[in-house]
Amino acid sequence: MKANNAETPDSSNAADTFKWLAAFVLAAAAVVGNYLYGEMSVVVRAAGVVVLIAAALGVAATTTKGKAAISFAKESRMEVRKVVWPTRQETMQTTLIVLAVSIVMALVLWGIDGIMVRLVALATGV
């Protein structure tokens, strides 16, 4: 038996659909409004776009998928804090090693290319 305060999946799905539609309409209103009011100041239009997009994101955040996305973002931020980032010295050393290996490989490939060009020229008699 379900609790009285729990939403049924159908009503939740319908509410989410309506919220996504409202978020889309708000975002579309930002784009269309920016186009239609092109003669107004850029600052006013930018403020309108920011407000409408913020409202669209706010509405989208109240949906089931929006709440899941916010939860995922919070968990991701916690994981980023756990990462042990390299020091500046380690980063510079690794970068210099990659640069040196890239230069050596470029010289090796250039040499092989030169040898192959000479072999083809020798074989074709050019």
UniProtKB/Swiss-Prot annotation:
Record's GO cellular component, any one? plasma membrane
Q: Which UniProt keywords apply?
A: Cell inner membrane, Cell membrane, Membrane, Protein transport, Translocation, Transmembrane, Transmembrane helix, Transport
Tell me, in one coarse class, where this protein mainly resides: membrane
Tell me the compartments it is located in.
Cell inner membrane
Q: Name one GO biological process term.
A: protein transport by the Sec complex
Superkingdom in the source lineage: Bacteria
Q: Does the keyword Ion transport apply?
A: no
- What sections of the protein cross the membrane? 20-40, 42-62, 97-117
Instruction: Mention one GO molecular function.
Output: protein transmembrane transporter activity
- Membrane topology, as annotated: Multi-pass membrane protein
**Pfam families recorded for this chain?**
SecE
Function per UniProt: Essential subunit of the Sec protein translocation channel SecYEG. Clamps together the 2 halves of SecY. May contact the channel plug during translocation.
Q: Which family does it belong to?
A: Belongs to the SecE/SEC61-gamma family.
Q: How does it assemble?
A: Component of the Sec protein translocase complex. Heterotrimer consisting of SecY, SecE and SecG subunits. The heterotrimers can form oligomers, although 1 heterotrimer is thought to be able to translocate proteins. Interacts with the ribosome. Interacts with SecDF, and other proteins may be involved. Interacts with SecA.
Q: Which NCBIfam families match?
A: PRK05740.1-2, secE_bact
Q: What is this protein called?
A: Protein translocase subunit SecE
What organism is listed for this UniProt entry? Vibrio alginolyticus
Q: What is the lineage of its organism?
A: Bacteria, Pseudomonadati, Pseudomonadota, Gammaproteobacteria, Vibrionales
